[in-house]
């Protein structure tokens, strides 16, 4: 359908790709697109890191589209016996694999896999703290759907552990490309303001004032090499989005979170249950994964 062979980072997507993916995703949301379009195609989910939403979204999408879907248990594979990624990819290609969905705790490991993939298409489902392109497409589609089809000029506050967040990196790159005013709220020191970001602040109140969109991120302690990050109790005192702080944003603000949420840390129960768009975001994510698979393999 499209000419996209590898989706490793947001920059792999042309504007035409993005628009076509959103059109397809909207059709899947409205149940107007054809299922079974990938009948006979073999897709392997190669996840080196735990996942709930992303893995489920891809597995459900693959099966709904009629593909032969296999999730490789890396802990029980020959990779744990010392087999190289190159040999693993060669084996999968020899077995007729058409597309590999990869998640890794190592940044840019997916690039090495893509180099060894031969004719297999490759999707990055999140690599270390580098990128998560399908989540960025999901978030862009969610915002467009809830904000009248346009993100240009919207104030988007990305709040939390931005330094370790692949979601933040991909969203900053994609949303700024389409004219969003990106603000970053983080307790961490930022020596270099990323391209596309208009404000970096340690104050949640400053960052979310007048915001159209608030995107919350969890603390990713598993990616921290030292223990100098503040405790959850201190973090929640300074950075938890509760109803009082939410009132600083616009009345029609949408609250997003890529998951998993840590209630009582970055988001209060009241905001999570009464003001967030998280479940709609998940629904959009399922449609986006169908759209990406259809676009690349259909």
Swiss-Prot record:
Carbamoyl phosphate binds at residues 53-54, 103, 132, 135, 259-260. The keyword Transmembrane helix does not apply. Keywords: Pyrimidine biosynthesis, Transferase. Pathway: Pyrimidine metabolism; UMP biosynthesis via de novo pathway; (S)-dihydroorotate from bicarbonate: step 2/3. PROSITE patterns: CARBAMOYLTRANSFERASE. GO terms for biological process: 'de novo' pyrimidine nucleobase biosynthetic process; 'de novo' UMP biosynthetic process; amino acid metabolic process. InterPro entries: Asp/Orn_carbamoyltranf_P-bd, Asp/Orn_carbamoylTrfase, Asp/Orn_carbamoylTrfase_sf, Asp_carbamoyltransf, Asp_carbamoyltransf_Asp/Orn-bd. One of its GO terms (cellular component) is cytosol. Catalyzes the condensation of carbamoyl phosphate and aspartate to form carbamoyl aspartate and inorganic phosphate, the committed step in the de novo pyrimidine nucleotide biosynthesis pathway. NCBIfam families: asp_carb_tr, PRK00856.1. Heterododecamer (2C3:3R2) of six catalytic PyrB chains organized as two trimers (C3), and six regulatory PyrI chains organized as three dimers (R2). Belongs to the aspartate/ornithine carbamoyltransferase superfamily. ATCase family. This is Aspartate carbamoyltransferase catalytic subunit. It comes from Anaplasma marginale (strain St. Maries).
